[in-house]
């Protein structure tokens, strides 16, 4: 009994220690955020919203401007509709003085989604939640402080929302899918299904890396459930269809062809080979193996 109590105390102390280290390590990042400012694509994607704000438009006008930006960009530049919507609402569109919120939004999304994802897994497995918190803190320390380009990960709205925010959405998405699978009450199933469908539509229209990986993982999970004859409800099929539909809508955008025409093309096979090659190169480079 005494040994168990000692172990629990140690786990609690470690969790508090790592949590404190994480919070203290965020201070320089938060201070730096007050010196950040909009750059490049921030201006182009938020021009319509900024125009509405300057002319005293209300919430409906702002949302209309955002959707118009999505439509225009979808037709003439890129198809990632959900990402473009987020781009159009960058903080400086309302005031350059609040651009620092970029860092707060990204850190909050990353921290909350990581904690939620790990906690969801530990709840299902029946493990000590404090150990899950410790693992979450370790993941966050590594994710935040060893990211290759901090300015694009946490300080630049266009870049950080495209990757950090949508990565956070994917963690939330898989967390909700797990909860949906194990939910017993109808009301919980309905709530989790609605959230999952919404996130599927958002992720399908996000950056292509996250959209593709999320689609592949979900397809693989469904395959495993079928293979092992586990219960698979119509809910998962609906979610997958929404995800893949959003992804396809994003890929077939006329704007993608317009943008591709400005670049030197290569065959699909060559593109895949280059993707795999540079994935290995950058993994080695970013992990210090090369």
Question: Positions of the model-derived regions?
Answer:
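Start-transfer (signal-anchor) and selected internal transmembrane alpha helices
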Residues: 1-27
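Membrane-interfacial entry segments at the cytosolic side of transmembrane helices
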Residues: 10, 129, 187-192, 227-241
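Transmembrane catalytic cores of multi-pass membrane glycosyltransferases
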Residues: 33-93, 98-100, 208-290
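Juxtamembrane "helix-exit" motif on the non-cytosolic side of transmembrane helices
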Residues: 90, 119-122, 144-155, 249-257
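Transmembrane-helix motifs of polytopic, lipid-linked glycan transferases
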Residues: 104-129, 172
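Hydrophobic core segments of transmembrane alpha-helices in multi-pass, intramembrane catalytic enzymes
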Residues: 107, 162-174, 213-221
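Membrane-interface micro-motifs in multi-pass membrane enzymes
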Residues: 131-181, 207
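Membrane-interface alpha helices of multi-pass inner-membrane proteins
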Residues: 191-208
């Amino acid at each position: 009994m005494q040994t168990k109590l000692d172990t629990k105390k140690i786990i609690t102390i470690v969790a508090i220690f790592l949590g404190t280290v994480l919070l203290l390590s965020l201070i320089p990042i938060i201070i730096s955020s007050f010196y950040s400012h909009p750059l490049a694509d921030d201006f182009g994607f938020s021009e319509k919203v900024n125009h509405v704000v300057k002319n005293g438009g209300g919430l409906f006008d702002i949302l209309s401007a955002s959707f118009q930006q999505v439509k225009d960009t979808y037709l003439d530049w890129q198809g990632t509709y959900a990402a473009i919507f987020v781009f159009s609402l960058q903080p400086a569109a309302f005031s350059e003085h609040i651009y620092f919120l970029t860092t707060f939004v990204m850190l909050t999304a990353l921290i909350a989604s990581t904690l939620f994802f790990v906690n969801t897994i530990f709840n299902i497995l029946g493990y000590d939640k404090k150990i899950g918190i410790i693992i979450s803190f370790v993941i966050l320390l590594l994710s935040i402080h060893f990211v290759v380009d901090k300015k694009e990960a946490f300080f630049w709205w266009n870049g950080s929302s495209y990757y950090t925010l949508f990565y956070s959405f994917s963690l939330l998405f898989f967390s909700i899918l797990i909860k949906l699978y194990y939910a017993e009450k109808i009301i919980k199933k309905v709530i989790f299904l609605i959230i999952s469908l919404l996130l599927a539509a958002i992720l399908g229209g996000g950056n292509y890396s996250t959209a593709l990986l999320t689609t592949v993982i979900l397809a693989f999970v469904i395959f495993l459930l079928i293979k092992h004859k586990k219960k698979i409800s119509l809910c998962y099929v609906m979610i997958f269809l929404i995800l893949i539909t959003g992804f396809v809508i994003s890929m077939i955008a006329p704007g993608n062809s317009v943008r591709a025409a400005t670049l030197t093309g290569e065959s699909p096979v060559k593109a895949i080979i280059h993707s795999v090659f540079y994935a290995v190169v950058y993994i080695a480079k970013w992990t210090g193996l090369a």
